[in-house]
C-alpha cells in the first residue's frame, strides 16, 4: 500500500515526486510489479476497513504470493495497525474464493522508528522468530533504496538513519550467526 498524502512529514514531496521516488526505489531493489492505492497517511483509520481488505485481496489474487509480509500490529503508527489488520483478513481470501491460491506464510516485519516503541502491548510485542541473511551488500542496498524517498532518512541516532539500520541488521545477524540479517515474526505457516 502506498500513501500519497504524507501530511505529517517535515518535508512533503509532491505526489509526482513521491511517485518518482517509489518508482526509483522499487526499480533499484528489483521489484517488477507494485500495487498502489491512495489511502490518506496518518488517517487510514478513516478509510472503511473493507476497502483496505479488498485492495490487498486484489493484489493477492493477481500476484499469488507464497508469503505476505506486513507491519506488526503493535507498531506505534496507526496506519501500520490498520494495514496489519486488513492483511490478516485478506490472507483468508482463499476461504471465501476457493479458486484463489492460499498464502503459505504470513510474516510481520520490523520497522525502525515504529516497532521498537511497542507501546500497544495489548497486541503483544514484535518477537522475531525468522531471520533472513541479507549480507553487507543487502543492507547497503536497503539504505540506498530508503534514501531514494525524500525526507525519510534522518541523521543518527534516529532509527531511520544508515547507522541505526546497519547496526540493527548487524545485531539481528549476530543473533542468527551471520553478519547482517533482517528479522521477522512468522505468525502463520501452512504446508
Predicted regions and their residues:
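A conserved beta-strand->alpha-helix junction
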Residues: 1-2, 27-40
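ATP-dependent adenylation/pyrophosphate-handling site
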Residues: 1-13
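Metal-dependent de-N-acetylase/amidase catalytic core
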Residues: 12-13, 42, 46-191
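A charged helix-plus-loop insertion that forms the helical arch/lid used to bind
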Residues: 14-19
